[in-house]
Amino acid sequence: MYRIVLGKVSTLSAAPLPPGLREQAPQGPRRERWLAGRALLSHTLSPLPEIIYGEQGKPAFAPEMPLWFNLSHSGDDIALLLSDEGEVGCDIEVIRPRANWRWLANAVFSLGEHAEMDAVHPDQQLEMFWRIWTRKEAIVKQRGGSAWQIVSVDSTYHSSLSVSHCQLENLSLAICTPTPFTLTADSVQWIDSVN
C-alpha cells in the first residue's frame, strides 16, 4: 500500500492536533511545516503512532509499527508518502526559476541525468531540472540520508528501488519506494482542511 497526500502548509499548520502534539513543535521558521506534517499524518492515521528520529534526523514510526512515511515541502505545499511496504522517500518542489539551476545541474547531475536534460527543448529544461532534482531527493530521503548526498545519487540508474515522478500543475513530485509503484495524478489525494 502506498498513499500520497498533499496539502497546504498555511491551512494544515492551523489544523487541530492530538493533545500535546502542538507543544512538541519547534519554534522558528520550521514550526508551520512541522505542524502541517503532523496534521497530515494524524489525518491519515488515527491515532497517530509514536514518532522517533533516525541518525540523520529522518522521522519514522517506532519499529513495532509496520508503516513507513516521508514528508516533503516546498513553498506552501506539503506532501506525505505513507507505506506498509518498507522505507520510502518523497520530494516535492514548486517548479520555479532558480538563478543558479544550470550551475547546480552541472555540479550534481550524473551523465545520464545530463543526457535527459539535453534531450528536451531548452524551453522545457527547467521542468526537467526539477523532475531530476525531485527524483534524486526522493532516493536520498528513502535511504535516510542528507541533502549533501544528492551528488552521489544517479536517478537514471536502475536499482531494486522504484522511482516515479508526476508533474501536478506547477509542482514536481517524486517518490522512491521499495516495490514497483507508478505515481500518477490519480494516485494523489489532496487535503484542503483537516477537522
Curated annotation (Swiss-Prot):
Pfam families: ACPS (PF01648). GO terms for biological process: fatty acid biosynthetic process; lysine biosynthetic process via aminoadipic acid. The keyword Disulfide bond does not apply. It is an enzyme of class 2 (transferase). SUPFAM superfamilies: 4'-phosphopantetheinyl transferase. GO terms for cellular component: cytosol. It catalyses: apo-[ACP] + CoA = holo-[ACP] + adenosine 3',5'-bisphosphate + H(+). One of its GO terms (molecular function) is holo-[acyl-carrier-protein] synthase activity. Keywords: Transferase. It comes from the Bacteria. Its EC number is 2.7.8.7. Belongs to the P-Pant transferase superfamily. Gsp/Sfp/HetI/AcpT family. May be involved in an alternative pathway for phosphopantetheinyl transfer and holo-ACP synthesis in E.coli. The native apo-protein substrate is unknown. Is able to functionally replace AcpS in vivo but only when expressed at high levels. This is 4'-phosphopantetheinyl transferase AcpT. It comes from Escherichia coli (strain K12).
